[in-house]
A protein has these predicted regions:
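N-terminal pre-catalytic "stem/leader" segment of glycosyltransferase-like enzymes
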Residues: 1-60, 66, 219, 233-240, ...
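Active-site proximal beta-strand in glycosyltransferases
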Residues: 48-50, 65-94
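Alpha-helix capping/helix-boundary segments
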Residues: 55-56, 78, 116-118, 239
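Membrane-proximal helix-turn-helix segments that form the acceptor-binding/catalytic region
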Residues: 89-110, 203
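A short, active-site helix/loop in glycosyltransferases that binds the activated sugar's phosphate group
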Residues: 105-130
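Short alpha-helical segment that forms part of, or immediately flanks, the ligand-binding pocket
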Residues: 199, 222-228
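Acidic donor-binding loop of glycosyltransferase active sites
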Residues: 203-217, 230-231
Length: 244
């Protein structure tokens, strides 16, 4: 049986994406063939599929998924067009705006990252075989890298990292404003295709300021910052409340 992993992007396309690193681990661990959504014209009814972020998949293809043999590795929410249930009161999507419910109901399993992540689905009456991972996923190689970088950066620079990105959800300008108002010297943490360099630059800092505008399902950056010995200034929106 052929085994495919389907997503809009992979870690080569988006080397700074936390979700893409999770996907990359799963692809390698289970020896899956990666398929970009943009390259899919039809599905193999005899194959097994893992679907990740598939917002770029045309609706007529989405409608065919329910008949396949598949699981979903979820990083956000596919039950409304914006993928942001937090925009609605109590995260409850109006009935007329709910989409893709059969996608979840017919999956062999739907892997979610936290209890909070799962509860948003349950509040919106989504039927599925949910499997709560209660965490993100790191490879042994990644964990060893974090440990080595932490050991090499015991002397902090006294600055607070602000992740500099065009992704509005990460709230770069708001984080810079917080630093200014609270007299914290900021360190601009630029996106970097080299993961070791990115985390090494983060590890030099005293802390990180991160107030995402959207409710994240699990912010790996915040957890990795904590692993690297940084003070973390954030809000409940970072999604990994069980950890600290």
């Amino acid at each position: 049986m052929k085994k495919y992993f389907v997503a809009d992007f992979n870690v080569i396309d988006v080397p700074t994406g936390g979700g893409e690193w999770v996907d990359d681990f799963i692809i390698k661990k289970f020896n899956l063939e990666f398929l970009h959504t943009r390259n899919i014209n039809s599905f193999d009814q005899t194959a097994f599929y893992v679907f990740s972020n598939i917002s770029l998949l045309p609706q007529h293809l989405l409608n065919q998924i329910h008949s396949l043999n598949y699981v979903i590795l979820e990083h956000d929410y596919k039950i409304c067009l914006s993928r942001h249930p937090w925009r609605y009161q109590d995260n409850i999507i109006p009935q007329q705006e709910r989409i893709n419910y059969s996608l979840y109901k017919n999956a062999k399993a739907v892997f979610v990252q936290t209890t909070d992540h799962m509860n948003v689905y349950l509040k919106n009456d989504v039927e599925a075989n949910f499997v709560n991972l209660e965490c993100s996923i790191w490879s042994d190689e990644d964990l060893n890298m974090l440990e080595n970088i932490n050991n090499e950066n015991t002397n902090k620079n006294g600055k607070y990292a602000v992740y500099f990105t065009n992704n509005w959800i990460k709230n770069t300008q708001g984080n810079l404003k917080y630093c200014a108002e609270n007299k914290l010297q900021n360190y601009i943490l630029k996106e970097n295709r080299n993961r070791v360099e990115f985390l090494s630059n983060l590890a030099k800092c005293e802390g990180i300021v991160f107030f995402p505008l959207a409710r994240e399902t699990f912010c790996r950056l915040v957890v990795e910052a904590k692993c690297l010995g940084l003070n973390v200034i954030t809000s409940k929106n970072y999604g990994a409340l069980k950890f600290f």
